[in-house]
Amino acid sequence: MMLDLGNESSVTMFILSGFSEYPHLHAPLFLLFFMIYTVTLIGNLGIIVVRKVNPKLHTPMYFFLSHLSFLDICYSSVFTPKLLEILIVEDRTISFKGCMTQFFLICAFVITEMFMLAVMAYDRFVAVCNPLLYTVSMSPKLCAFLVAGTYMWGVLCSLTITYSLLQLSYCGPNIINHFGCEYSAILSLSCSDPTFSQVVCLTISIFNETCSLLIILASYVFIVVTIIKMPSKGGLQKAFSTCSSHLTAISIFHGIILLLYCVPNSKNSWLVVKVATVLFTVMIPMLNPLIYSLRNKDVKGTVSRLMHLKLQAHST
């Protein structure tokens, strides 16, 4: 849909192409993504509930993990419902305001999660390198400050990038070659010079990726040095199990981001971008609860206890 503004026309509605080139895959993809989204909600809500009901998990590490789960629910819920909708209905439209809102939210949640993972790396550094002063160093006030800072920074960065997109003119075409309002897909529809927006996005992206990775790298360099100096195998095993889940989550998260950065800008690359975005917005939120809970005895023990209590309640 176009709105006439003098001699120009402005787009008021976008059409999401999704996976329209593969109509025969729509039904199986819908079932697959619906199951993944259900597991994502159950898994991440489970982490939040488990942390609340088990006093042993009222530690900085699980405080940050519960916020990571909350972010996974949020950014998965921004993209996945719309993806499911365009797979089963013919009307694949999204309003201009709706599109920009979706982009703002996904951008804010992803940047916040990026720095939440960096904060968690710092938390692991303090836990391994200074265990005796861990509870003092990672005080509730500091934890709240770090979490609030990540949310505020994510919102600020997202507002800046979204503002740069809103300064562009969109006078047609209005078909977004994606299943959601992803930055490069929106930018490709602009009929004005996108240089300012590209510079803003590139600057913020490079700064955020570099800063978060430097915090993570510095934390784990100190952790590795501390582990090497440990005399007992028990301490080494405990330190490794503490960090392995977080390292796995970081590798998947940043690996897919770097893949998206490295995709060449060509027509053939759009399928790669779509698949990578699906992995990022649909798969990662599902995997994080599994990564953090499978090797964690406290989490598994709490889940087993809750299930046992529920079964007892049903049997009585």
From Swiss-Prot:
It is found in: Cell membrane. InterPro entries: GPCR_Rhodpsn, GPCR_Rhodpsn_7TM, Olfact_rcpt. One of its GO terms (molecular function) is olfactory receptor activity. CDD domains: 7tmA_OR5D-like. It is a multi-pass membrane protein. Keywords: Cell membrane, Disulfide bond, G-protein coupled receptor, Glycoprotein, Membrane, Olfaction, Receptor, Sensory transduction, Transducer, Transmembrane, Transmembrane helix. Residues 51-61, 123-141, 229-239, 292-316 are cytoplasmic. The chain crosses the membrane at residues 29-50, 62-80, 100-122, 142-166, 206-228, 240-263, 269-291. Gene3D superfamilies: Rhodopsin 7-helix transmembrane proteins. Olfactory receptor. PANTHER family: OLFACTORY RECEPTOR. This is Olfactory receptor 1165. The gene is Olfr1165-ps.
